[in-house]
Amino acid sequence: VGHPLIERLGELQPRTADEAHAREGSPPTLLVLPGSRRSEIARLSEDFGGAIMQVRAAMGPVEVVLPVADGREMEVRSAIAGWPIHPTLVHGEAEKFAAFRRARAALAASGTVTLELALSGVPMVVAYKVSKLEEQLKYLIDVPSIVLPNLILGENAIPEFLQKECTPEALA
C-alpha cells in the first residue's frame, strides 16, 4: 500500500544550496499550478492572475512558471490571456520538477500536485473552486482539509482557500 509518487522521490528532491545560490540576483520563481481539468483552470485563473499581481506589487519582480498539464495548453493560454504578466509555460514531468527545484513558492489547485510540492519542499498556498451544485455536496462530506499533505499530517499546515475564500487577496 502506498502512493505512486513514492517511486518518483528522486525527481522530487528539494533544491540544493548550489541551485539556490545559482539563482541569486534573479527574481524569485513563483509556480502557478491551476489544475489539470478544464473546469479547474477556468474557475481559478482569474483569482490566480490577481494574486500574482498582488505578489508582484508587494515583492517586486517575480518569475512566474506555469507547468501545463498534457492536452491543456489551449485552455491555459486562453485563461491567462488577460494576465498582465506572461508566465513561462513548461511541459512534461521533467520540466515541471525542474521548476519545482527553482521555486520559492507555489500557488496550486488542490490535487496530487500538492503532495508533489510538499515532497519537493516547496511552500504553497492551495485553492479550489467547484460549481454551485458540487458545493452542496460539502454537507455530505466530512474531511478536515482538501489538501493531501494536511490530511497526511493530521493538521492544516498548508493554507487552503475554497470557494468564496478563494480571492486574490487571500491567495497573495
Question: What residue ranges belong to the model's regions?
Answer:
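Nucleotide-activated sugar donor-binding and catalytic core shared by glycosyltransferases
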Residues: 1-172
